[in-house]
Amino acid sequence: MAEKENYDHPVYKHVKDIKDADAVAWAFVNKNKMVQFPFKFPEVGPDEIRINTLYAGLCQSDVHTVREIWGPCLYPMAPGHEIIGEVAIVGSNVKDFKKGDLVGFGTLRTCCEKCEYCVKGKENLCREVPEVFTYGKYWGGYATAMQQPAKFFFKLPPGFKLEKGAPLFCAGITTFYPLEKFLEPEMKVCGVIGCGGLGHMAIQFLHKLGHEVVAFTTSENKKDLLKKLGADKIVISKDDAQMKAAATTIDFMVNTIPSNNTNFNKYISCIKRGGKLIQVGMPAFDDEMRINVNMLVSCEIEILGSCVGPRKPTDKMVDFCAKNDVYPIVEEFPFEKIPEAFEKLENGRPFFRCVVNMKDFAEKNGLKK
């Protein structure tokens, strides 16, 4: 029996003719089917902005969302939380943005501004309002335009590379923020576990910040590229001899691997006494990490989690990347080939990050408004 296809949405109105649409999304109408979805927005609210999407990154979190790995999904769903755009319409209360501004937008879309976390500048930990994240009923970057609260847009500085910058608003801040929060100056030797979309960003940040970087990877064929990105040493983690040689050499370790099938103890054994392991890779909600507690206690090793990042560190990251030419390696796809990019992402074959050029399709179809 075929799965039901849902075209009714509580916020966005599906229209049949693209000429009547404000935008077109690639939306999932059920767990397994993605379609081009012309739609109309509600009126822009006083505290909102509508942008024309220029570039949108694809993230593994999109897969987790629409495949319901992280729980029930509201269909139709147009995901995407790595977004570069141009401001098209500004709400009446919005003072910090104007039409034509180039902006970025990421995983967080709103917060309460009042809870104990918000008042400390930790909006990423706010759970006091619904739809904090760009994963729910308010659509994201898989559409030629997007409408969201103004307070989580970020102005882009002159010289910012628009075609490469979208993944910075997820992969970038996910790896930049824990360095801001947890990395101490005396921690000179830093390791990165997993050298994919997140890991290759962590390597670049650590290198530009002046640390010695050790990259842990299973991919022999990435060695030369990782060195160009800033890795001082490459450890092939499936090689027992190399892992043994790396024992107790790392002050600060960033783990980008989300899988619960990983033998974390072999990585923990590489951390110095008093060192830190920062977990940023996020698996399914019921996955667990198995570790040797004796090793943690006897060596006073800290394990810490980090969830994307608040607004101030994101602004700082944007400026840092523009000034230091730190960007992800991306494969670019046209809007028409989002399903192809998504399939490549889901099957673990992108060359670091997939980015979709949204602007060409929008301009060709009269959707830039």
Predicted features and spans:
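Glycine-rich phosphate-binding loop and adjacent beta-alpha segment
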Residues: 209-211, 258-329, 358-369
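Short glycine-/small-residue-rich Rossmann-like dinucleotide-binding loops
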Residues: 57, 91, 108, 239, ...
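NAD(P)H dinucleotide-binding glycine-rich loop of Rossmann-like/cofactor-binding domains
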Residues: 38, 111-193
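N-terminal Rossmann-fold NAD(P) dinucleotide-binding loop
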Residues: 199-200
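C-terminal hydrophobic helical "lid"/dimerization subdomain
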Residues: 2-21, 208, 265, 311-369
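Glycine-rich beta-strand-centered segment in the early N-terminal region that forms part
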Residues: 40-56, 69-116, 157-160
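Adenosine-nucleotide cofactor-binding segment
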Residues: 189-195, 207-266
